[in-house]
Structures are given as C-alpha cells and as structure tokens.
C-alpha cells in the first residue's frame, strides 16, 4: 500500500483499476488538495507500489525534461537568425555530431543513470524523504531548492576542478570536452565515472540535507532535479541572449561562463554561480586573463617599490 496518504482507510477508498478513476476518487475524498497534489496522490495510489511509482516517475521525468529542454536549442541551431547570439558562431554542431551525442546520452541514461534512479525509493524511506500529500509550502521548497543550488555548485566546482588534473582528465573528463563548442544535448555527454561523481552534487546534497534535518519531500526533489537539468542544458546551449538570466543576476554563470570553459579547456569550473571561480581566481577567457595579468603587474610594481624604499 502506498504511503501517499497517512491513512490506510483513505488509501483503500481512492484505489481503482484505472488512473483516471483513481484521480476522480482522490478529488472526491480529498477536495482540499491542489491540482498537482491530486495528480501526485492518484499516481502513487494507482501504482500501489511506491518503489515502482518513484522509479518510473523519476526516470520519465528525467528523460522528458532533459530532451524537452534540449529541443528548443536544437531548433535554434537550425535558424541563422539566432547566430548573432551564438558564442562561437562558426561552430554549429552537425547532424552527425548531434546523432552521435544523442546515442551516447541515451546509452548513459539507460545503463548508468537508470540503476540509481530505480533503486532510489528504498533510500528515501530510510532517510525520511516523504511522498505524502499535501506538499510543503512554496516558501519551504524555494528555500530548500536555493540551498541545493548553492551546495551543488560547491561540489561541482571542486569535483570538476579535480577532473582537470592528470589521469582524471585523460581517462574521464576528456570525453566531455570532445565538443569545444558545446550544445544543449552535450550537457550529459560524459564518462560514466563523471556522470556519477558530478551527479552526486544533484542527488547527494539533498540526501545530506535530509540526513541533517530529517525532513524532505520527494516533490521538492522533483522540482529541484528539473531546474538543475534546465540549468545544465542551458549552460551548454552555446547562446547568450540579452534576456539570459546572467544579465539579470550577474552572479549567475550561464552559457557564456561555461562556453569559455569548453573553448579554453580550463577555468570556470562552477556550474550555476560565478563566486567560486571569482574568489579562487580560476575565471577563464581573455578578459579574465587580462585582469589577472594586470593584478600581477601591479603586485610586482608594489613589491619592487617596497624593495626600493
């Protein structure tokens, strides 16, 4: 029996042989639930197996949201009008490159990412990640997701930076740098070891959070993973528009930040924000290099002046 309702009698009342009938029953017995909560409760009640319900939902969510976000960038790449905002306008991915990348990404999704996704619910039960309705408040979810963005960005910066050293780059991260001019679909084109290690930032940070607080809702995780997927695809899109988020939030990394990383193969290691690269002087690109050289020049002049005095 599903744990979506903390009431065995209610769980029995809403169950039906079809999903649509289950949804009607949920709406009848729980009219106070909002639109999403009713569909959520009906899904878990209809499946009547939380392990299967969570596994299937997470897998389909990941596939749909990833390719749903990749599709607009694929279309934009075919329209010359948008080249004015392309960061590397002479490097448009060919159909052959897109197809090769698609095959590799699908292989990764089904052979690498599917196993942890399908075995995730038992861990949820042990950690206290709940599927019950109603959902947490919007304020609670927003604060938690904001924290996850900050924590994931921190993990990503240090893990990504490690992947640019020696054997880690040669045998693992080099695969992701096959494309010096990234495109949306290439966001998850990576070695399995990189997929799992960098993916820990997305899933592992919420796990650490719930281990500390003892409370987290699975719907919050769904929203977080969706936003993280959108961020990853957008940062690999290769386009920087006047309305891009980094124009509104200067500390947001965006496509321009990550495109420089792929172009120069070094620096700009963070995923969502710019502060780690700024504070640790790992910003990439001509402007960052010029600024770094200017600071070094001034430092040398100051040291020379001190010695003279």
UniProtKB/Swiss-Prot annotation:
GO biological process: ergosterol biosynthetic process
Essential cofactor(s): Fe cation
Gene (UniProt): ERG25
Naturally occurring in which organism (per UniProt): Saccharomyces cerevisiae (strain ATCC 204508 / S288c) (Baker's yeast)
Motif (Histidine box-1): 160-164
Protein name, entry field: C-4 methylsterol oxidase ERG25
Motif (Histidine box-2): 173-177
PANTHER family the record matches: STEROL DESATURASE
Keyword Iron: yes
Disruption phenotype: Affects mitochondrial activities and leads to an increase in intermediate sterols and a corresponding decrease in zymosterol and ergosterol production.
Gene Ontology CC annotation, any one: plasma membrane
E.C. numbers: 1.14.18.-
Subunit structure: Heterotetramer of ERG25, ERG26, ERG27 and ERG28. ERG28 acts as a scaffold to tether ERG27 and other 4,4-demethylation-related enzymes, forming a demethylation enzyme complex, in the endoplasmic reticulum. Interacts with ERG27 and ERG28.
Residue ranges annotated as motif Histidine box-3: 257-263
Domains: entry comment: The histidine box domains may contain the active site and/or be involved in metal ion binding.
Assigned keywords, A-Z: Endoplasmic reticulum, Iron, Isopeptide bond, Lipid biosynthesis, Lipid metabolism, Membrane, NAD, Oxidoreductase, Steroid biosynthesis, Steroid metabolism, Sterol biosynthesis, Sterol metabolism, Transmembrane, Transmembrane helix, Ubl conjugation
Composition-biased stretches (Basic and acidic residues): 289-301
């Amino acid at each position: 029996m599903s744990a979506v309702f903390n009431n065995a009698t209610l769980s029995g009342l809403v169950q039906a042989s079809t999903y649509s009938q289950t949804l009607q029953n949920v709406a009848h017995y729980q009219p106070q639930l909002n639109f999403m909560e009713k569909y959520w409760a009906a899904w878990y009640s209809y499946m009547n197996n939380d392990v299967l319900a969570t596994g299937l939902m997470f897998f389909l969510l990941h596939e749909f949201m990833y390719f749903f976000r990749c599709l607009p960038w694929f279309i934009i790449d075919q329209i010359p009008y948008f080249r004015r905002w392309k960061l590397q306008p002479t490097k448009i991915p060919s159909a052959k490159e897109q197809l090769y990348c698609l095959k590799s990404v699908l292989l990764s999704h089904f052979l690498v990412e599917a196993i942890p996704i399908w075995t995730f619910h038992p861990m949820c039960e042990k950690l206290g990640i709940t599927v019950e309705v109603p959902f947490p408040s919007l304020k609670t979810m927003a604060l938690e997701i904001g924290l996850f963005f900050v924590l994931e960005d921190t993990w990503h910066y240090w893990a990504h930076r490690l992947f640019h050293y020696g054997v880690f780059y040669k045998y693992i991260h080099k695969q992701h740098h096959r494309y010096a001019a990234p495109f949306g679909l290439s966001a998850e084109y990576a070695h399995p070891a990189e997929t799992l290690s960098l993916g820990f930032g997305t899933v592992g940070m919420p796990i650490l959070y719930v281990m500390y607080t003892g409370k987290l809702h699975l719907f919050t995780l769904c929203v977080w993973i969706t936003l993280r997927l959108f961020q990853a695809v957008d940062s690999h899109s290769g386009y920087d528009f006047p309305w891009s988020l980094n124009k509104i939030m200067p500390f947001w990394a965006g496509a321009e930040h990550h495109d420089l990383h792929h172009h120069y193969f070094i620096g700009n290691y963070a995923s969502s924000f710019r502060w780690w690269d700024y504070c640790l002087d790992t910003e990439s690109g001509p402007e960052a290099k010029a600024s770094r050289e200017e600071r070094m020049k001034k430092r040398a002049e100051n040291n020379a002046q001190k010695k003279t005095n």
